């Protein structure tokens, strides 16, 4: 009887030790993840410039929505993107890259690939909205919602997913922070026409592992919005608001 009692102790200790070892391993993973994946905006060496990828929606055969005769969404978004790029010429802190330089077809996958290739710290996709009626107006800011993975199996897979979820959380927090900055700046362009921040699956943002937002800058179906967006002075105003948002973010 005594032998049986004594022989059962090592098994309980072994089980306990395995549990303790996994807890220690998990703690180390969490600590290392914080060291290896700091907040996105501090990941760059301070001697390097932050890279912002501006994505002017549509292009080439894809016109987007029509604002007036001969003027389409693809034209307005590219003009605004180029104006932003011009505002940062000579900047020692921030470098602007565009997902398309002219009126060309650029698949969504190539836009994402360019963000990854350029090691962008921030992604901003610019669009013009359209509604089912003439009353809808103003701007909207979208960011990719957070989704945890539930497919992990085993201790190592679970710890790996925890690290990934921590990175996703940081990117989401930074995306929301930038979205709020944009919201405040754009309110000066479209006063009292803020349609709020929108969370959800955004196609153009999927596959990105950096802070990223999509801006719907106004409604082509609304006469007042359409007139604003077709005006060159207003396009410069929008570009300046977005440039100031980028500066404030970093």
Over which residues does each language-model region extend?
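Bacterial N-terminal signal peptides
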Residues: 24-35
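Catalytic-core regions of hydrolytic enzymes
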Residues: 41-161, 168-173, 178, 240
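Active-site-adjacent mobile loop/cap segments within catalytic or ligand-binding domains
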Residues: 128-133, 183, 187-250
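Alpha-helix C-capping/helix-to-loop hinge sites
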Residues: 166-169, 226
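N-terminal secretory signal peptides that target proteins for export/translocation
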Residues: 1-20
